[in-house]
């Protein structure tokens, strides 16, 4: 059972790293799209007005194209944050909760950028842990198998995570 659990954890690290690469790219793209676009709680209203104007053949601010693309990316991020699928039993309130975890066009540009920056750090962390797990597996074998110092991958991972926090505490 332990070997099976260890293999599942190893696979989890690799899956998280692969997902993180896609998430990271999407976050950077969203940040670039909305870099100079003023957004906030009224963005959905403005988007609908721009859509009506476009339907009537009127020119609209090209920023609205960026907003539409960013919304599509935000929807993809919801799936990524949910593990690739929302499943059959997910309620609307669950989806709304997951949406609010990630960057959205309804957030202020500054607030959204803080969320994007943290999510990129988290994605980078997942990629690093996946690489570390692969290296350990190649050198030592199973993740729970101790090395010559008597420490397992998880011991080193705990120490590394403590030394490399995603968020530094305010003084």
Region spans (language model):
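A sequence/structure-level signal for intrinsically flexible, low-complexity segments enriched in small
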Residues: 1-171
